[in-house]
Amino acid sequence: MKPEKLFSGLGTSDGEYGVVNSENISIDAMQDNRGECHRRSIEMHANDNLGLVSQRDCTNRPKITPQECLSETEQICHHGENRTKAGLDVDDAETGGDHTNESRVDECCAEKVNDTETGLDVDSCCGDAQTGGDHTNESCVDGCCVRDSSVMVEEVTGSCEAVSSKEQLLTSFEVVPSKSEGLQSIHDIRETTRCNTNSNQHTGKGRLCIESSDSTLKKRSCKVSRQKIEVSSKPECCNISCVERIASRSCEKRTFKGSTNVGISGSSSTDSLSEKFFSEQYSRMYNRYSSILKNLGCICNYLRTLGKESCCLPKVRFCSGEGASKKTKYSYRNSSGCLTKKKTHGDKERLSNDNGHADFVCSKSCCTKMKDCAVTSTISGHSSSEISRIVSMEPIENHLNLEAGSTGTEHIVLSVSGMSCTGCESKLKKSFGALKCVHGLKTSLILSQAEFNLDLAQGSVKDVIKHLSKTTEFKYEQISNHGSTIDVVVPYAAKDFINEEWPQGVTELKIVERNIIRIYFDPKVIGARDLVNEGWSVPVSIAPFSCHPTIEVGRKHLVRVGCTTALSIILTIPILVMAWAPQLREKISTISASMVLATIIQFVIAGPFYLNALKSLIFSRLIEMDLLIVLSTSAAYIFSIVSFGYFVVGRPLSTEQFFETSSLLVTLIMVGRFVSELARHRAVKSISVRSLQASSAILVDKTGKETEINIRLLQYGDIFKVLPDSRIPTDGTVISGSSEVDEALITGESMPVPKKCQSIVVAGSVNGTGTLFVKLSKLPGNNTISTIATMVDEAKLTKPKIQNIADKIASYFVPTIIGITVVTFCVWIAVGIRVEKQSRSDAVIQAIIYAITVLIVSCPCVIGLAVPIVFVIASGVAAKRGVIFKSAESIEVAHNTSHVVFDKTGTLTEGKLTVVHETVRGDRHNSQSLLLGLTEGIKHPVSMAIASYLKEKGVSAQNVSNTKAVTGKRVEGTSYSGLKLQGGNCRWLGHNNDPDVRKALEQGYSVFCFSVNGSVTAVYALEDSLRADAVSTINLLRQRGISLHILSGDDDGAVRSMAARLGIESSNIRSHATPAEKSEYIKDIVEGRNCDSSSQSKRPVVVFCGDGTNDAIGLTQATIGVHINEGSEVAKLAADVVMLKPKLNNILTMITVSQKAMFRVKLNFLWSFTYNLFAILLAAGAFVDFHIPPEYAGLGELVSILPVIFVAILLRYAKI
């Protein structure tokens, strides 16, 4: 938009209004400290509680009332009186003087009209506002609207406030798009039924004048000073519309649709001066930001650095804590969707959603039906009767979700506390299955975690957690996977602390404990140390270190189970004493006391089992282990009650067992669960890669002072010192010192790696004898350790095929046990009556004892845990040796590897080509210069080698345009004089018959040809060195009977020479292979079309090891794709296994870990089958001379699960 077009048509008019140079004001406000701005506003309210006054009109007359000030403003608005009353000095505005920051009053240009819908008096703006139509609710941000991409809606105060010069009050507001892609036109803004219109009945001082002009909404309001607008913006792709938006915003030129032209005063000379000023201002800002857009590509980051509002569409901000800050500069909403009014400090009020603190709650249908509010706002200094009309939008529940503030999908991670077996996991999956908004679900019993993609248009996280809590007994908590977090200890109650003003960069607060707050923040805006030390108005301190959420959830659940078990033991001991003491067991008082204690155990300790079993039956249609516990313990307890009743009436039953059976049964079950949880928690924690993270760092400030700090307080820009033999706290670049670093625990590299200035160091590695000064490059939560741990966790969330088999067996196990129990009960009644000649009552009692024992001694959990516990340990063991399994299926099949296919360059070789011979024809300098211009910037190893070689010889690159790389073939471009330049593989360029090319190929070199207009100008012979462990790895793989292959896009001579050195058959190599040909070759092997007849008995398992982008298709096609870490990110994403260090012997590590893991899985299956078989036979009385007493059957879970966990843990100490 051209400046002259923007300001055309301006002239004199009867209606006049004031103009404020908002560029100067906004820069001054944005550069000011936020806390200082807020402090000033508080002081201003304390000194002047009169309302809005004009700086020149009213400040010099302190006794003026708000009504008098407003009356003068209306006189200016309607009669065009002396403009100096309003302080509208254009010269001051233009020169950036003090008056540019003074409060100014916007005059209105027509008389008030009554809005027919709400009955509110609204000042007309000489346009559509007079009709009371929809435009009265349209507005724009900072006087500028998104013309073709989106429109932002802003709720601002329409009230008058007294402020001193240069004081900028901070107004909180939210902006909400009505569609996920943003509003496409001003017609997308529509008015909705307001909640509690009583609060909006009076607009005497709160006038909001809105009209539209040239498809751009313009807004003006009665406002002393331009308020700083705070939004949370998500930068989008910036374009020229952003430049126009910023330029318009800087000018603060308010134009309205209609025939009435608006000027600064009634004087034509003043109008001309004003128009000239705004035109110049617009042009200056337009040119400035056009240049920034051209150079940086994104203006948002530049504005963010300056503390300014983004030029792109803002998004809604939310607080997921228990309450939002009363002083925070942002507004928040809860799931109720209702706007309420909440008292804050002083005489401020805030439109809020916290129904718990509401003075009133909206009862309109718009709030009861809508889950989302259109607009929230902070109103300063006035009561609800003075709040002007709220600009709201149409209900948008189909487009906007409270948790994310937009449509689309969001990746959610939930911690799940309370899962103990695969039955629990199956129940969780069924509960998720009832939710249409959940997709891509992954659950992990071992990690106690669930991940899924949430369709925000169909539900929120709160809805999901509410449904899960209703249908299952587990406890859920969302784990944040965005930004950074830090826990701090606050000096008073956490619920009060969240009402403190939030520093810039803080996005969310969450109450962890009574006086511990978890802060979510953007580390690029504010560092953790600054946040803790200087971010708050009250002193806070960093909280004690807590484990990763997945481990922390397990710890908390372990504590709960431990406390419950301890209580059960305490209550059971007196029962056992009274039952086993001969002098006490026959007394009614003793038995009555036992009954009371047993009842507490049955309904307090074992009570959750009842609820869990009922939820599983009702909501998930599952019969699980909890049902067996409920049936067995209930039978024992009811039998004891009945037996006690007979004893009281003087007809005791033959059995002497009373309440000790049910009580001891419950207690032993709890002991078994506690020990199992403890072993499982220790197992997971022991192989956690995050345990390698150091806990402290030595910070070096600008003066050289050294301070030891908690590692969580590191922030961008820090320099830390690494002492000899200490662990490196986080990733960084060495800026001073030299040493050798042991990276074995991170990369598996056994030899120390030399480090010097500009070397990269990674978190978790151990420094040698030297001292290093390192500049931080990655924060602890995003460093190498965290990245590796994330990939390992992803593998733990996947399930191998063998796990599906185990789950299927476990699902039939409980119904089978119930059937065996019924059969056992019936058989023992028959045996008691027919064989043992017992009375019917005695036969029934005996049958009940055997039935109870069968129910409780069996353990389906051992079958479900046999696979996942081993795979979790295996993935951790492999990670500590530099091998990252990205899926459990890779662990399952790697031990069956039958073929290993290698890419040559960068995989079998170092990937660092060197030029050994050069042939240049014609003008040598010109050819080399053109070639350097062509290859410079191309990331292919050959192009990089050529460019490096030419630069070392002092060649200067010529300008080459239209450069394009064709993967696996060539790179081409055009010289400044129009010459067609090509370089690359001689075969694809059609020069393989050139004598120089043939000579180089015969010698086994890789050949690079350079042609100009189709004629060969230069030929380069290159060679690459084998990796140090290539020969030994190939030999060991061959000894295991694995077939070896080489695929390469390189020349045939170089590939065959490499194969000969490694002893690989010529029939198993392919040269000049394109990515598609590599994929086809691997596919033939996988499908058995390229295998020996001896290997046709089972499907081949093919491992393809590559590093480049051109290997990505092959990595996907193979059974297992292995990526070398120094390769491209595309290849890394396509791979199933990632090698942290480019060492080929890691392939052997991968296969060995898989072999040992699968051996332990089979061993666990064997144990689970053996245990359940013999335990059930013993419990059912199959052995005449021996059977398990029912009170000791509760040890079954302990006896069955501990060996499984023990076998898995032994993998840590296996020789790999």
Swiss-Prot record:
Checking PROSITE patterns in the record gives: ATPASE_E1_E2, HMA_2
Extracellular compartment residues: 579-592, 642-659, 832-847, 1182-1190
Question: What keywords are annotated for this sequence in UniProt?
Answer: ATP-binding, Cadmium, Cadmium resistance, Cell membrane, Copper, Ion transport, Magnesium, Membrane, Metal-binding, Nucleotide-binding, Translocase, Transmembrane, Transmembrane helix, Transport, Ubl conjugation
Q: Which reaction does it catalyse?
A: Cd(2+)(in) + ATP + H2O = Cd(2+)(out) + ADP + phosphate + H(+)
This entry's Enzyme Commission designation comes to: 7.2.2.21
**Subcellular location per the Swiss-Prot or TrEMBL entry:** Cell membrane
Q: Where are the transmembrane segments?
A: 557-578, 593-612, 621-641, 660-680, 809-831, 848-865, 1162-1181, 1191-1209
> Where in this protein does the record put region Metal-responding degradation signal?
250-350
Cytoplasmic side of the membrane: what ranges? 1-556, 613-620, 681-808, 866-1161, 1210-1216
Q: How does it sit in the membrane?
A: Multi-pass membrane protein
Q: Where is the HMA domain?
A: 410-477
Look up the record and report any one GO term of the cellular component aspect.
proteasome core complex
Gene Ontology BP annotations: cadmium ion transport; detoxification of copper ion; intracellular monoatomic cation homeostasis; response to cadmium ion; transmembrane transport
User: What's the impact of mutating C298A?
Assistant: Abolishes copper resistance but not cadmium resistance
Give the residues the record marks as binding Cu cation: C421, C424
Cross-referenced NCBIfam families, in alphabetical order?
Answer: ATPase-IB1_Cu, ATPase-IB_hvy, ATPase_P-type
- Function recorded in the entry: Cadmium transporting P-type ATPase which plays a critical role in cadmium resistance by extruding intracellular cadmium. Capable of high affinity copper ion binding, but not active copper ion transport. May play a role in copper resistance by chelating and sequestering copper ions.
Q: What is this protein called?
A: P-type cation-transporting ATPase
Q: Which organism is it from?
A: Saccharomyces cerevisiae (strain ATCC 204508 / S288c) (Baker's yeast)
